[in-house]
Amino acid sequence: MKKTLSLLLLLTLILIPARAADVQDVKPTKNVILFISDGTSLATVSTARWLQWYSHPDKPNLNIDPYICGTVRTHSSNAPIGDSAPTTSCYVSGQPSQTGFVSTYPVNCGNDDIYPTDPNRAYQPTMTLLEAVKMFKGGSTGLVFTCEFPHATPADCSAHSYNRGKYEWIAPQMVHNNLDVVIGGGVSILSDDMEKYLKDNGYSVYRNDLKGMRADTNNKMWALYADREMSYDLDRNPDEQPSLEEMTKKAIEKLSKNDKGFFLMVEGSKVDWAAHANDPVGMATDFLAFDRAVGAALEFAKQNGETTVIVTADHGNSGISIGRESCKGYDKLTKDQLFKNLSQFKLTAEGFAKKVNTIPNSEVQSLFREQAGFELTKEELDALNNCKDYKFSPIPEAERHEKSQASMYSNSLSGLMSQIITSRTCMGFTTHGHTGEEVFLASYHPQGDRPMGMHTNIELNHYMCSLYGFEPSFLSDMSNKYFARHTDVFQDYTCEIIPAKEGEVAPTLIVKNKKDKKKQLTIHAFTNVVKAGKKADQDIILNSVVVYVDKNNTFYLPESLVDFLK
């Protein structure tokens, strides 16, 4: 018996080479791929796994399953329930922050702060791991996602703002931050000037051009799809938009050509969006699309031998549960009763909403028969016809009822579709917002140096830093060096802030050397280009972006810029 147990233990150790990774002992790898499934509670992962197993009996496991190694306590600097902006910011910068802050140091909130904060650093940009890999390792960097490109998670890796909604500040930073590969949504946000800058600097740029992206051989590429966010995977037209798996493979193909290594962040963006909508179909199917992308990265990592893959979520969302009060006899419910209806939906709530608004009212029932396996009830039809967003209602808009969502009436067509979907399942929800539980953590390291157990968001950042040989304090130290206040950097020179002109998104900083009038800097915010000389006719190209914060009327920029005035 002892010999049998010993043999089983030995086999376990051989099959699962893993140990709790002390930051000091982690063996660095040349490449890191960070996967973030936005707004994904553990029950979302379970739902996706069950749905896959029910639909494909030969696939009981997800790609992440052999690599699940713990959980992450993720939160804001001043609140246990996190917003997407500060949560991923902490993963990539090591600094917890607060709602809306994109890789930006938080404002001190006194006793509400979970960790101590320095009030003197409020609003300072915090350097990200992506920026550090590019600047100090010479590595390539990339972002893959299905939201629009300046949205919180991709922005967290490559831009800085105290307001995640300020796309006019965030988008130009991402364009000027020397990213090698960007694939995702947001065609309408990339201006002609931004596209020109990219092309002038050697990038291939594709807008809704799937064939172009597939054929591209340039190592520097932006490929964007849809005006804003891309479609849910279940709703996606494969002739128009690539899957997250294909985008991930394309990014790896390009980034891996750099012998100095790379950093890639891949986000399953719309798992979170479906969770906000309480749409279990969108949540589960988009997570499965995310898991397929993880599978592609794991395959590369195993063949490459120099790549770490980390998979997690930035926070929970919706309080989703498998089982709810209306499904009586929960412990007697069969897998058919729990998952058959869920498996029959061929569109997400958003997909149904869009489709319903393109067909006559008389064809609605046939749509649901074909795409969901049931017809709407009289109450559901009544709710649809009274929905403000429904274009083909026989009821004039002014005469439509305004009743609460609880009674199945909603001004949002997508929201109504979510209610209809959920009512056919045994999935439960507690909220349309984020939740504060720990999230799952999975990882692959070629030597088995994985973070085991429960880790904080800060510890996860330190682990990733160690993979590149960076000390835990490195990003904070570099934040002070490359995002210093202009008043400190140019304290011996004359500074004038020129208000933004019409069409400009931020003021301009003019810095003069009073003793030598030829030495002058013209500094525009949110770019990496500084103009030198009295006529501003010389370009200084930075390897970081300049950030302006209106809250304190301050430009944050590299300390070394002062050398051009001496």
Model-derived features with residue positions:
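Extracytoplasmic mature domains of secreted/periplasmic and thylakoid-lumen proteins
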Residues: 95-179, 186
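Active-site-adjacent structural elements in enzyme catalytic domains
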Residues: 27-39, 43-44, 49-52, 121-136
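Cleaved targeting-peptide boundary
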Residues: 21-27
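Positively charged n-region of N-terminal signal peptides that target proteins for export
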Residues: 1-4
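Structural beta-sheet core signal
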Residues: 34-35, 143, 311
